[in-house]
Amino acid sequence: MNTGSAIISIESELAAIVGREYLRESASVLARHAIDGVVPEYVVEPGTEDEVAALVRLANERKLTLYPEGGRTGQVGRTPPRVDIVLVTTRLNTIEHYDPGDLTIGVAAGASVLSVREAVAANNQLLPVEVAHPAPSTIGGVLARAAYGPLRHGYGPLRDSCLGLRFVTGDGRLAKSGGRVVKNVAGYDLMKLLIGSHGTLAVITAANLKVYPAPQQTRTFVADFASLSEAIAFRDTVVRSPLTPMCLEIASPLAQEFFSSHSDRQTWRVMLRAGGSDAVTARYARDLGSAVTHVFEAQAEEQYWNSVIDFGERVSARHQNAMVVALSVAPSELQHAIEVAERVANENNLLVACSGRCAIAALNLAFIPMPQGAPVVTQYAQALTRLRESLAPDAACVVTRCADQVKQHVDVWGATATDVDAMRAVKRALDGNDVLNRGRFVL
């Protein structure tokens, strides 16, 4: 895009693919689709998979960068060097098939999480996908990020609920992996490479997903403890027991201030959500006994879990300069990881709120400046460095939210993966010219 004629040519080619009305060029629209402040040259909204393939093919041939986008609700990654094209998937929003008897549903990537939830709920079924903004969030975006919420404990990671994907590779080829039903999923599981690859290997265009019978009823049991060690001991007791909760969460005293209901005491909280018949929930009440300090059900329960899911959003709304980190460690290392986070926060004049899945040890850590106001960038950089240095080598520590000026001084992803050669080989095979999401992910 060095000359005026080249720009006119690209505009014409983009418009020929999607139609002039779906080529967005106004300054205000382009600004709304900026990525970490980097404004795109063009925003396009394809309506079919063929249009997606044609757009990626054009970008590949013209050596342009292309960034897939869903509902803009969970963008994570490094600041891109430049953004030529943002490809918005929200016009690809159909439910292609739904078979309640087989517990499967096929949806286009731009379908909203809310619309799919509502479709399966009409048949008393459940899609275990939880995001802070289900109306704008898209299925493709959730898959690209491998996003999950509290239901991850009971239903497993999202990749286990994905039966098949259709996608467009970095050179514009339409492809698929997996199938429509469980028995058809065989061979090399390429789709599991795409889930969580943040759009750097391919543009996801459609997905076949497993759904689950919705529980007859749910009830949430809350246990408050004076110390972190007591909360971890309770977690261990639950994990060793016959109980199989849908959700099993932990929250620090500060994290609870962002929930819809919290204790006024400085206590650590463990939350279990049980689903099933009256007999099942009665079993939980009996087995948990005096450890339970609160019980939520019906509307109060829904409000409570929505606030837990919205934790990162609520922190950012109240503290715009906060830094939120997604942390994953071995379950046996959870207490140590939290204690390290609290120590490095204190050393750098920060507060830290912890909330997340305590059985699988996947947490959100919200670092908040103290006193309130704009933090010194070095505070966050030093805290993040010390946190990563103090954790096991296999721990994952990813910055999911921070101010732009902070991102310029920290590595969002952390240390380069040990299997980087294999990752580069996959990238070369699917996106050899580095068209997709350039500069955003670990490679």
What kind of region is each of these model predictions?
Residues 33-36, 75-81, 260-263:
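Short glycine-biased active-site loop of nucleotidyltransferases that positions the nucleotide triphosphate
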Residues 49, 227-229, 274-281, 330-334, ...:
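Helix N-cap motif at beta-to-alpha junctions
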Residues 103, 266-275, 359-368:
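A generic structural motif
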Residues 2-4, 39, 64, 71, ...:
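Conserved glycine-rich FAD pyrophosphate-binding loop
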Residues 14, 33-66, 83-85, 89-133, ...:
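N-terminal glycine-rich flavin-associated loop
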Residues 20-35, 66-68:
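N-terminal glycine-rich anion-binding loops that anchor highly charged ligand groups
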Residues 1-22, 26-27:
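A charged N-terminal "starter" segment
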Residues 144, 163-321:
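C-terminal substrate-binding/cap subdomain adjacent to the FAD-binding core in PCMH-type
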